[in-house]
C-alpha cells in the first residue's frame, strides 16, 4: 500500500479552499447575459469553446492533491445540479463557493463546524419552501420561450424553437437535439409513432423519387415471431387482397421464401405489401409491439398466448391512416386505436417510469409515452463551424432541460432576484444557538452571490446593484443585458424553480460537508527509484 500524506485542521482547509476557488473562478466567469466564454484545450482537434458551467468544471484537475480534492467536491455540485435539472450548474458553483468561503472564515474564528452546518441546512430548507411559494406555473408558449432564451444565453431563436416544439408534441413529447447541416436552426416534427427500423427489401419501395414506401390506410399485421414459411401467411394475404387494401407486416423478422413471395406479390401488383422488423430487443420488443397494437387497434399474434399466424383474420389487424417507411425508419400516422385504450396504456407506462431504477430504462419508457401520447420533435442546430456547432448544441440542450424543469415546477424571477427575495424573507430566522445563527447568516449571504456575480460579469459594481435590488420588492431586479432596473417577469427574465432549488440544495449539501472537514488524506507522490550506481565487478 502506498504511503499517505495527511493534513489536519486549518492547513487542510486552506488547501481545500484554494482548490475550490480555482474551479469556481473558472466557472463563474460564464454566469449571466454578459458572462464570457471559456476555452478548453483538447488532446486532439480544435479547442472547445463553452459557456456551460458543468463543461468547464469537468475539465479541471489540479496538480496539488489536496487542492484537487476541494475542486473535485465542487465539481460534484455542478454535476449533481446538471443531473437533477439540466441547468443551473454555474449558479450552484457560485453558491457553493460563497458558503464554503464564509463558512471556513467562521470556523477559523472559532465557531463549531457542526452547528454551522445545522444552521446552513435549516436556512436551505426554509429557503426551498419560500421558493415554492414564489413559484408561478409556466404553461404558455411565451413563458416557455423566455425560459429557453435565458438558458441558451439570451439566444431568442433557440427559445422560440423550443416553445414551438413543445407546442407541437405536447409536454410529454420527446424533443431531441441534433447537429444540422445548414447555418440555420430548424425544427422537424414527426407526428405519429416512429421507430428505427426500415423496409426489409428495397423492392417494396413505391415512391422511387423519395426512396420510400408509402401505404395509404393499410392493415397492420403484428407478429412476435420470425416468419420464413409463406404457408402461414397465405390466409392473411388472401383476406387482405379481397379487402383491396395494402398490408404492413411488423415481425421479429421476415426471411427466406416468405420475403421473396411478398416481394413478387408486390411487384406484380397482386397485394401491396411492406415488411419491417419489430423495434427493440427481447422484452422491450414485446412491449413496443404491444404499444403499436394499442395505437392501431390490432392484436399481437404471439404463440405465448396461443395465437397462430395461420388463424389470424382481418379483425386481428391494426389499421392506420398512413404509413411511411424509408431505409431506416418507419412512421405510423393516425392509428385507429381507441383513445381510452391508448390513455390506459400511457398511464401504465408512466407507472413503470415511477418504479424504474436506471436512467436508461426511464429514458426508454419516456420515449414510449411520447410516441403514444404526443410525437417526436427534432431540433437541428445550424452553425458555420464545428467548434461553434458543439458550443451551440450544448446551449440548446441546456435550454431544453431548463424549459422542461420550468413546465414541471414553475418559474421564479430570474437574474438572481428570487434568491435575494428569499434571503430577505428569512432575515428573522434563528437557530438553537449563536453558532447556528452564524450558519444561517452564511447561507443567506450566499443567496446574494449569484446576483453579485451576474452584475460583476456585466462590469458594474455588485454592492450598489445588490442594495438597489434589496430595496425593491417582488420581481424588481436588475437586467444586466440592458443595464436597467424593473420587473424581471416583464423583462422576460425567468428561471425555472427546479433549477434554482437544485442549485441551492446541492451547493449547501457539499459545502456543509467541506466546512466540517478536519483531516484530509491523499497518496504521497511517488519519487523516482533511487539510483543504485554501477554494480561491483572485476577492475582493470
UniProtKB/Swiss-Prot annotation:
It holds the Pfam family Cpn60_TCP1. PROSITE patterns: CHAPERONINS_CPN60. Its EC number is 5.6.1.7. GO terms for molecular function: ATP binding; ATP-dependent protein folding chaperone; isomerase activity. It is an enzyme of class 5 (isomerase). Signal peptide: none annotated. SUPFAM superfamilies: GroEL apical domain-like, GroEL equatorial domain-like, GroEL-intermediate domain like. The keyword Chaperone applies. Keywords: ATP-binding, Chaperone, Cytoplasm, Isomerase, Nucleotide-binding. The keyword Nucleotide-binding applies. GO terms for cellular component: cytoplasm. It is found in: Cytoplasm. ATP binds at residues 30-33, 51, 87-91, 415, 495. One of its GO terms (biological process) is protein refolding. It catalyses: ATP + H2O + a folded polypeptide = ADP + phosphate + an unfolded polypeptide. Together with its co-chaperonin GroES, plays an essential role in assisting protein folding. The GroEL-GroES system forms a nano-cage that allows encapsulation of the non-native substrate proteins and provides a physical environment optimized to promote and accelerate protein folding. Belongs to the chaperonin (HSP60) family. HAMAP family: CH60. Forms a cylinder of 14 subunits composed of two heptameric rings stacked back-to-back. Interacts with the co-chaperonin GroES. This is Chaperonin GroEL. It comes from Erwinia aphidicola.
Amino acid at each position: 500500500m502506498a504511503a499517505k500524506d495527511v493534513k489536519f485542521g486549518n492547513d487542510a482547509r486552506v488547501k481545500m479552499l484554494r482548490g475550490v476557488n480555482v474551479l469556481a473562478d473558472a466557472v463563474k466567469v460564464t454566469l449571466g447575459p454578459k458572462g464570457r466564454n471559456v476555452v478548453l484545450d483538447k488532446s486532439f482537434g480544435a479547442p472547445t469553446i463553452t459557456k456551460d458551467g458543468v463543461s468547464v468544471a469537468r475539465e479541471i484537475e489540479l496538480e496539488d492533491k489536496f487542492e484537487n480534492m476541494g475542486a473535485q467536491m465542487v465539481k460534484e455540485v455542478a454535476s449533481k445540479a446538471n443531473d437533477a435539472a439540466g441547468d443551473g450548474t454555474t449558479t450552484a458553483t457560485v453558491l457553493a463557493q460563497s458558503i464554503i468561503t464564509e463558512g471556513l472564515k467562521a470556523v477559523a474564528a472559532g465557531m463549531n463546524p457542526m452547528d454551522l452546518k445545522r444552521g446552513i441546512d435549516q436556512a436551505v430548507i426554509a429557503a426551498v419552501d419560500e421558493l415554492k411559494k414564489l413559484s408561478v406555473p409556466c404553461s404558455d408558449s411565451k413563458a416557455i420561450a423566455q425560459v429557453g432564451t435565458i438558458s441558451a444565453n439570451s439566444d431568442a431563436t433557440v427559445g422560440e424553437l423550443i416553445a414551438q416544439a413543445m407546442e407541437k408534441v405536447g409536454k410529454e413529447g420527446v424533443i431531441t437535439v441534433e447537429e444540422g447541416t445548414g447555418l440555420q436552426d430548424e425544427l422537424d416534427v414527426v407526428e405519429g409513432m416512429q421507430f428505427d427500423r426500415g423496409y426489409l427489401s428495397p423492392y417494396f419501395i413505391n415512391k422511387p423519387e423519395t426512396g420510400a414506401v408509402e401505404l395509404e390506410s393499410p392493415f397492420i399485421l403484428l407478429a412476435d415471431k420470425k416468419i420464413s414459411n409463406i404457408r402461414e401467411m397465405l390466409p392473411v394475404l388472401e383476406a387482405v387482397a379481397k379487402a383491396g387494401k395494402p398490408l404492413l407486416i411488423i415481425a421479429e423478422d421476415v426471411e427466406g421464401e416468405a420475403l421473396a413471395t411478398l416481394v413478387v406479390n408486390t411487384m406484380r401488383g397482386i397485394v401491396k405489401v411492406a415488411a419491417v422488423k419489430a423495434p427493440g430487443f427481447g422484452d422491450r420488443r414485446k412491449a413496443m409491439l404491444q404499444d403499436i397494437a394499442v395505437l392501431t387497434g390490432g392484436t399481437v399474434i404471439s404463440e405465448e398466448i396461443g395465437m397462430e399466424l395461420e388463424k389470424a383474420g382481418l379483425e386481428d389487424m391494426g389499421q392506420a391512416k398512413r404509413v411511411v417507411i424509408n431505409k431506416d425508419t418507419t412512421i405510423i400516422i393516425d392509428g385507429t386505436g381507441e383513445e381510452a385504450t391508448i390513455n390506459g396504456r400511457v398511464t401504465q407506462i408512466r407507472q413503470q417510469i415511477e418504479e424504474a431504477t436506471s436512467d436508461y430504462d426511464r429514458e426508454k419508457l419516456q420515449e414510449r409515452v411520447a410516441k403514444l401520447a404526443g410525437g417526436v420533435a427534432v431540433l437541428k442546430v445550424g452553425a458555420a463551424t464545428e467548434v461553434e456547432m458543439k458550443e451551440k448544441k450544448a446551449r440548446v440542450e441546456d435550454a431544453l432541460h431548463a424549459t422542461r424543469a420550468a413546465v414541471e415546477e414553475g418559474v421564479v424571477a430570474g437574474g438572481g432576484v428570487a434568491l435575494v427575495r428569499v434571503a430577505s424573507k428569512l432575515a428573522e430566522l434563528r437557530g438553537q444557538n449563536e453558532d447556528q445563527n452564524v450558519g444561517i447568516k452564511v447561507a443567506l449571504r450566499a443567496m446574494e452571490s449569484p446576483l453579485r456575480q451576474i452584475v460583476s460579469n456585466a462590469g458594474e459594481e455588485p454592492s450598489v446593484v445588490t442594495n438597489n435590488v434589496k430595496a425593491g420588492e417582488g420581481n424588481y431586479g436588475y437586467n444586466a443585458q440592458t443595464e436597467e432596473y424593473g420587473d424581471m417577469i416583464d423583462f422576460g427574465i425567468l428561471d425555472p424553480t427546479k433549477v434554482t432549488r437544485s442549485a441551492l440544495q446541492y451547493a449547501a449539501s457539499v459545502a456543509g460537508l467541506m466546512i466540517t472537514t478536519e483531516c484530509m488524506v491523499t497518496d504521497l507522490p511517488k519519487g523516482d527509484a533511487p539510483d543504485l550506481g554501477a554494480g561491483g565487478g572485476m577492475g582493470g
